[in-house]
């Protein structure tokens, strides 16, 4: 497969650094399978769906997983080192995989202090620049420490242009987020849903269901040849309960469409769908990799933001709609100056 067909040039000024205010005022590009493109707003969403259609949200919660700490000087001839840490994945009660900068100034056994009573020891260094951190707290105490001292882990294309702040605590967390905080990135299509929009969704007779997928940093990593040769992506934990699976199958059998809100919800549905399109309850990791030519079994439409060029997510939307149509839609979005990525505008894909 030629990965160059999934590349496109995006002007940097179209990368949104803050969400629209209010968030349901973002623009919405409606993409029909016959090639029609309609410029709308997110609040128009109910107009393009049918009574009984089911919006499927990812209810994961984002951890304030970005930390600033200090590695004390090792001797009188050296200095303390300021360290930026981004937690990636929980590995045990106190153990977390993380990315740390400056990695070259760190070694096994180093202690990093984030606040009084909150620290971690480097248990080991891993390939790809990751480190394994052994924290001095776990469970609810760890979550409380992150809430007190961590910042929201903004995507790299935002973080390199501005630091996270208190506003991101509100705007980078969906209203569906459950209590299980384990994601290091938000399911960003869900950020557009305000109480006002949710009321309009309900008034239009649309249904809502939730699934859960904990989003990892792999969502921002570039595709590599091994992903194609192995037909696998990074693993992410996901869950669909038996009750939700039954309701989704019943809705579809009655003629309703399943409309995942975001690629993480779509990956969850597709990873739990059989060849007949029936959705099965499941809990555990998935490394599903959807690309053009792969069957899409459980997704009838998709609401999603605009994705990075050359990314697995742009390949996913191309699997649903076709590569040529998605390239045309993105070209239109760029020409019309839609805002891209996590805090940007959205599109509604109707095959």
From Swiss-Prot:
Name of the protein: S-adenosylmethionine:tRNA ribosyltransferase-isomerase
Annotated compartments: Cytoplasm
Primary localisation category: cytoplasm
Encoding gene (name): queA
Entry EC no(s): 2.4.99.17
Pathway entry: tRNA modification; tRNA-queuosine biosynthesis
PANTHER family listed in its UniProt record: S-ADENOSYLMETHIONINE:TRNA RIBOSYLTRANSFERASE-ISOMERASE
Biological-process GO terms, alphabetical: queuosine biosynthetic process; tRNA wobble guanine modification
Keyword Transferase belongs to the record: yes
Subunit comment: Monomer.
HAMAP family, A to Z: QueA (MF_00113)
Cysteine disulfide partners in this protein: none
EC class: transferase
Organism placement in taxonomy: Bacteria, Pseudomonadati, Pseudomonadota, Alphaproteobacteria, Hyphomonadales
């Amino acid at each position: 497969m030629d990965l160059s067909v999934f590349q496109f040039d995006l002007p940097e000024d179209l990368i949104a650094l803050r969400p629209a205010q209010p968030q349901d005022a973002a623009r919405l590009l409606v993409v029909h399978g016959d090639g029609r493109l309609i410029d709308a707003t997110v609040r128009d969403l109910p107009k393009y769906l049918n009574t009984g259609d089911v919006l499927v949200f990812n209810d994961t919660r984002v951890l304030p997983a970005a930390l600033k700490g200090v590695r004390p000087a090792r001797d009188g001839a050296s200095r303390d080192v300021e360290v930026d840490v981004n937690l990636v994945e929980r590995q045990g009660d106190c153990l977390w995989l993380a990315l740390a900068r400056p990695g070259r100034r760190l070694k096994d056994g180093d202690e990093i202090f984030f606040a009084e009573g909150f620290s971690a020891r480097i248990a080991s260094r891993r390939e790809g620049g990751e480190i394994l951190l052994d924290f001095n707290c776990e469970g609810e105490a760890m979550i409380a420490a992150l809430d007190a001292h961590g910042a929201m882990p903004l995507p790299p294309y935002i973080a390199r242009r501005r630091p996270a702040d208190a506003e991101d605590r509100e705007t980078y967390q969906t209203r569906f987020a459950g209590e299980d905080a384990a994601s290091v990135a938000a399911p960003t299509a869900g950020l557009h849903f305000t109480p006002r929009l949710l009321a309009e969704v309900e008034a239009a007779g649309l249904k809502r269901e939730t699934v859960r997928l904990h989003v990892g940093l792999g969502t921002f990593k570039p595709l590599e040849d091994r992903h194609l040769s192995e037909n696998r992506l990074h693993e992410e934990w996901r869950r669909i309960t038996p009750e939700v699976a039954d309701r989704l199958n019943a809705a579809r059998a009655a003629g309703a469409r399943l409309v995942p809100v975001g690629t993480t919800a779509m990956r969850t549905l597709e990873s739990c769908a059989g060849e007949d399109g029936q959705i099965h309850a499941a809990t555990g990791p998935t490394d599903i990799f959807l690309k053009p030519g792969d069957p899409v079994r459980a997704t009838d439409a998709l609401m999603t933001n605009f994705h990075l060029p050359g990314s697995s997510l742009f390949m996913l939307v191309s699997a649903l709609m076709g590569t040529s149509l998605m390239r045309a839609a993105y070209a239109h979005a760029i020409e019309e100056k839609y805002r891209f990525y996590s805090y940007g505008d959205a599109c509604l894909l109707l095959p």
